[in-house]
Amino acid sequence: MPSLFPIEECDMDRLYEIEQAAHLVPWSLGTLKNNVGERYLNLKLVEKEQVLGFAICQTVLDEATLFNIAIDPVQQGKGYGSFLLQGLMDKLKEKGIQTLWLEVRESNPARFLYEKLG
């Protein structure tokens, strides 16, 4: 069963690999590294000691913005995206976050995941 853990500096190379494979217009390694700090809730999805995906989320007061979410394309379609997003939302609720914002292109297939989870 997969688990969620905070992202660490040592994860960045693997996250960058996933980012490059999962997105048509991927973030640079520098952008990934710059989206960390006390105002972020960044999680990695791990199963059998392998990082399969991640979420980058910034929090401000009682709101959060999901900046990036990615699952290794080899692992897509197995429910990992739902697990990651639901886990992120649960952790945000624990922190008192009431609202999660995100921006998504209408053509992005992940839109259906976002709609499904509300």
Cite the ranges covered by each PLM segment.
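Conserved acetyl-CoA-binding loop of GNAT-fold acetyltransferases
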Residues: 115-118
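Acetyl-CoA-dependent GNAT
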Residues: 2, 6-74, 82-87, 91-95
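Conserved GNAT acetyl-CoA-binding A-motif
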Residues: 92-103, 113
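Helix-turn-helix DNA-binding elements, focusing on the entry/boundary residues of the two helices
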Residues: 66, 110-111
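Short glycine/proline-centered loop/turn elements that form peptide/ligand docking sites
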Residues: 81, 85, 107-110
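Amphipathic alpha-helical segments that mediate coupling or scaffolding at interfaces
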Residues: 34-35, 103, 107
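Short Asp/Glu-rich motifs
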Residues: 38, 111-112
